[in-house]
Amino acid sequence: IYNVDKIVPEFVISTEPTDGGIDRGHRGRMEIRVDVKGVRCHGSAPERGDNAIYKMADILQDVRALNENPADDSVEIKGLVKMLDPKYNPDHYEDARFLGRGTCTTSQIFYTSPSRCAVADSCAISIDRRMTAGETYKSCLKEIEDLPSVKKYGDDVKVSMYWYDRPAWTGEVYKTECFFPTWINKESAPHVQALIDAHHALWGEERLWADDTAKAKREGRPLTDKWTFSTNGVSIQ
């Protein structure tokens, strides 16, 4: 639409579910891959090889720590919650607090081995990374590259980003990195205020609900909020 048809919208209304409110942004996301090399050998003498799965086990623990740790000096790996602190994110911490902290989780694991009786010579994982305001794909890749276990294994580890190149139903292929940036519209933006004013005029200041169950979940919540998951808004902003 943008590259070929040259359509440049002034604003876009996403029809993703909002739980009866008006959502004005959400975190970005990217898909990271970590590959580890080892040396295969027969399982009867594992000391002759170099088990890639064991190396990856160390990396997995560090990825978990990156997501779960606090941001103080008591830990070697400062957690992603640090981006809510103006000390680490002076220009964007307020937006980060609205959108929520970034997260990472291991979503897939792969390996190669000659058989069930051999030492694995490679192991790889996929990491689902959700990004808050102030984070970039470069900073997220560097966080993984700087993990103690990744540094420990040096050239045996490769950190990269996935690519999308799946053909559409027309056969068209738009190869693109698996990176979709964080986006946020200020509540004071004219198009956001127009939606708020329209909602107030039609239904009042509360979120919409159809029954008591929905009312219990929505009553008293801010009318304007954000999505927790990633919507197609990442390809629009």
Task: Place the predicted regions along the sequence by residue.
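Contiguous, small/hydrophobic- and glycine-enriched helical/loop subdomains that border
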Residues: I1-V12
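Metal-dependent amide/peptide-bond hydrolase catalytic core
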Residues: P17, R24, E31-Q237
